[in-house]
């Protein structure tokens, strides 16, 4: 039996990844396809312990306090454990997996800790580590949900009802988020991701409009 397909929904915080991934998985299931939705980090698993320590500031108050290679390893191990225990067999048996974040998040959030001239080397290392050395499957397609930074910040503030203390070390650092957006734009352009522009005239497009575009991209990939 041929292996399955892996479609990734990527984007910065506040871009609506979880909503769009869930809607896409439901749509594909309703069309008769064998589909599973996964989310990273896998906070329900013990494998995310180092990720939680990192994001809660136990290794430093700023994202840059943890170098990108160490931080990437935290997330990679979490993905490996998830693959081995939750979705690997399903994927290997031909199922369609919809991922809310994946290896692509390391590309976005950890590249941003480095000067741009080092991005290509880091990306080669990150993907070689996860796909070749760890044996995780590479995605068949990545959909990048692009959101204007001001809109993203407003959405995140609303998520926590104005309580800034609930934000993790990434979400609290505006300058870091700006760098991550630049890294995301670079990755989308150079790694062949499909970009969905989620904001229009300073506001989010409707969930339904965005989902229609996401579905069209998924159908094009799945055939």
Annotate each predicted stretch with a short phrase.
Residues 31-128, 132-134:
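ATP-dependent small-molecule kinase phosphotransfer cores
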Residues 17:
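Conserved lysine of the Walker
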Residues 104-182:
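A glycine- and Lys/Arg-enriched "phosphate-lid" helix/loop adjacent to the NTP-binding pocket
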Residues 2-6:
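Pre-Walker A (Motif I) flank of P-loop NTPase domains
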Residues 25, 150-223:
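NTP-dependent small-molecule kinase module
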Residues 9:
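Hydrophobic anchor at the beta1->P-loop junction of P-loop NTPases
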Residues 12:
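P-loop (Walker A) phosphate-binding loop of NTP-binding proteins
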Residues 20:
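Hydrophobic positions on the alpha1 helix immediately C-terminal to the Walker A/P-loop
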């Amino acid at each position: 039996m041929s292996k399955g397909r892996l479609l990734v929904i990527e984007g910065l915080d506040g871009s609506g990844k979880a909503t769009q991934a869930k809607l896409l998985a439901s749509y594909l299931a309703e069309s008769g396809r064998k589909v599973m939705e996964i989310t990273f980090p896998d906070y329900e698993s013990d494998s995310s312990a180092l990720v939680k320590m990192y994001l809660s500031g136990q290794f430093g108050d700023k994202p840059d306090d943890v170098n990108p290679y160490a931080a990437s390893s935290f997330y990679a191990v979490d993905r490996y454990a998830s693959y081995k225990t939750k979705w690997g067999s399903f994927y290997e048996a031909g199922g369609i997996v919809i991922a809310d974040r994946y290896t692509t998040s390391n590309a976005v959030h950890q590249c941003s800790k480095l000067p741009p001239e080092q991005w290509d080397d880091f990306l080669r290392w990150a993907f070689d580590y996860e796909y070749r050395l760890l044996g995780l499957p590479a995605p068949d397609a990545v959909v990048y949900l692009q959101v204007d930074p001001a809109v993203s910040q407003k959405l995140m503030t609303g998520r926590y009802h104005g309580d800034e203390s609930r934000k993790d070390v990434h979400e609290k650092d505006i300058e870091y988020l700006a760098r991550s957006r630049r890294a995301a734009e670079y990755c989308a352009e150079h790694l062949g991701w499909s970009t969905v522009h989620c904001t229009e005239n300073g506001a989010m497009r409707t969930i339904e409009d965005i989902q229609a575009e996401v579905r069209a991209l998924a159908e094009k990939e799945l055939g």
